[in-house]
From Swiss-Prot:
Top-level taxonomic group: Bacteria
Segments passing through the bilayer: 65-84, 91-113, 118-140, 153-175, 211-233, 249-271, 286-305, 312-334
Pfam family, one: Cons_hypoth698
Primary subcellular site in the record, as a coarse category: membrane
Lineage of producing organism: Bacteria, Bacillati, Bacillota, Bacilli, Lactobacillales
Family that this chain belongs to: Belongs to the UPF0324 family.
PANTHER family recorded: INNER MEMBRANE PROTEIN YEIH-RELATED, UPF0324 MEMBRANE PROTEIN FN0533
Annotated source species: Streptococcus pneumoniae (strain ATCC BAA-255 / R6)
Disulfide-bonded cysteines: none
Record's bilayer topology term: Multi-pass membrane protein
Name by which UniProt lists this protein: UPF0324 membrane protein spr0034
Length: 336
């Protein structure tokens, strides 16, 4: 059986949902195309779940396309530029990532939340939302319903942050520089960071958007050490005392992601325009939307809602902790 005859129907279903979601995401950037894709997929699940000819293509899209998307994501990271501009925000970023991951670990231990779901919520809250979840899910072998649940939790607090942060920043008397650092650190998805910073700029005729985006990109770099650590930890759990294979410890798609980041950094240092990589970054985003479509189509919405209480609570605790840690660290380093 050829690849297309086996996977074509499922991939086509994901493609159609993704095109619609991409269009809707352009109109409602606070929500974003990946969230539209996952929810449209879940709404269609009751009607399409009986069509078994879709299964192979959905599995390919939710796993392989997601890995390809993560590799292409590397072409959006110029490591030297991010470090040069974003280094002043590193103490805040490292503090918030650490506190969120510690909370996620303790929560799953004391409240019996599934470890993989807690991990996804933790990395999604602390690093960069859907992109971090997309990179982490294949590494820890998370199930589709766990990915869908984590994305849904992150989405809720993303929208909430984009709506209330400009008002909160005004109430706290944040400077323009302070709000850029606050939004770039305490909001976990690029679209929501953009929405919050743009709203602030509209209120105060400032230019915080670029700074907030660079802080966000600096956070994105944490995907590399976090996924490598989780991959090693997962391999240790599976292999126990058996010898570990390099491919199992460090999945190839993560290594390719790192190589893509290094290649981008090298080429831009040699004079290649960053716009050269724009098509690859856009393709990465679209493949993530396709993967989310597949995950949505494989997820029972009713069952997910019934089991979401603990994950929403974890998301809320992580979100509040990140806000408080960000503001506390900003006060300490004098960027308020």
């Amino acid at each position: 059986m050829s690849f297309l005859s086996k996977n074509g129907a499922g991939i086509l279903a994901c493609l159609l949902i993704s095109i619609l979601s991409w269009y809707l995401g352009g109109f409602f950037p606070v929500i974003g195309a990946p969230v539209f894709a996952i929810f449209i997929g879940m709404l269609l699940h009751p009607f399409l779940s009986s069509y078994k000819q879709l299964d192979a293509g959905l599995t390919f899209s939710s796993k392989k396309l997601l890995q390809y998307a993560v590799v292409l994501l590397g072409f959006g990271l110029n490591i030297s530029q991010v470090f040069a501009v974003g280094q002043s925000s590193l103490p805040v970023i490292l503090s918030t990532i650490s506190i969120a991951l510690i909370i996620a670990y303790l929560f799953q231990r004391f409240f019996a939340l599934d470890t993989k779901l807690a991990t996804l919520v933790g990395v999604g809250s602390s690093i960069c939302g859907g992109s971090a979840i997309a990179a982490t899910a294949p590494v820890i072998h998370a199930k589709e319903k766990e990915v869908a649940q984590a994305i849904s939790v992150i989405f809720f607090f993303n929208v909430l942050a984009a709506l209330i942060f400009p008002t909160l920043g005004t109430w706290l008397h944040l400077s323009n520089e302070g709000f850029a650092l606050f939004a770039g650190t305490a909001v976990n998805d690029t679209s929501s960071v953009t929405a919050a910073a743009s709203a602030w700029d509209s209120l105060y005729q400032s230019n915080t958007l670029e700074s907030a985006t660079i802080v966000k990109l600096t956070r994105t770099l944490a995907i590399i050490p976090i996924t490598l650590f989780l991959s090693y930890w997962q391999s240790r759990q599976q292999e126990n005392k058996q010898s570990l294979q390099l491919k199992k410890v460090f999945p190839l798609f993560i290594l390719y992601f790192i190589l893509a980041s290094l290649l981008t950094t090298l080429l831009t240092s040699l004079g290649v325009s960053s716009s050269f990589f724009t098509p690859l970054k856009q393709l990465s985003k679209f493949l993530i939307v396709m993967a989310m479509s597949a995950i949505g189509l494989k997820t029972n919405l009713v069952a997910m809602v019934k089991s979401s209480g603990k994950s929403i609570l974890l998301g809320a605790i992580c979100w509040i902790a990140i806000i408080l840690t960000t503001l506390g660290m900003q006060t300490l380093i004098g960027i308020f």
